[in-house]
Amino acid sequence: MSSKNCESEGLFGTIKVGIGAGLVAGCALFSSFLSIDQQLNIPHGTFYKTIGIPMGVEGFGAVLIGLLMHITVAALIGIAFNISASYWRTFRIVTVPKGILTGAVTGAIVFSLAFLPLHTMVMMPILETTLSSPDSVVSILPEEKEALLELIKGNDFVLWYSAMLHVLFGSVLGLMSGFLLHDRYRNVPRIRSIW
C-alpha cells in the first residue's frame, strides 16, 4: 500500500508542515492540560510537574520542563503523522475532514501506545517514590506534595481526561495538516467526496 512521495516540496516540506501543525495543536490544548489541575482543585501546573519532578527538577522549573516536553513531543508527533500520511496512500490527507479523522485516530494511538505506558509504568512510580522517599534529590514543599498526592489519587480522572485530550489533539493536528496540505492534493481524485 505504499506509494512514492513525489511532491515538489518533498520530505523537508512535509516535516515543516508536521512541525507547524504539531505546535499549533499542542499550543491549542495547553489550557486544557491546565484544566486537569482545576478539575482536581490543585494549583495550576501540578500536572506538568509530574514530568519535571521525576527528571529531578523542582518548583516552577518542573512546570516549564513539563510544558516544553509536551510541546516538543507534539511537534514530533506532527512530523511522524505528516510523513506517514505522505508516504501511505490510505492515510494521505487529501481533504480536511479526512485529516481530522486520521488525526483523531492518531491521537488515540498515541494515547494507548505512548502516554498510557509512560504515565502508568514510568512517571507515576517515579513520582510516588520521590514523594515517599525522605532522602529524595528533589526538595518538594509540603503544599506541592499535598497537591501531587491529590493528583495521584485522581489518576483515573487524569487518564480518562488525557484520553479525550489526545483524541482532541489529534483532531486539531489533522485539521491543521489538512489546511496546510490542501494545495498539495488539490488535483487528487476523491472517493465519496471527502475521502
Regions of interest found by a model, annotated:
Residues 2-195:
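Juxtamembrane/disordered regions of integral membrane proteins
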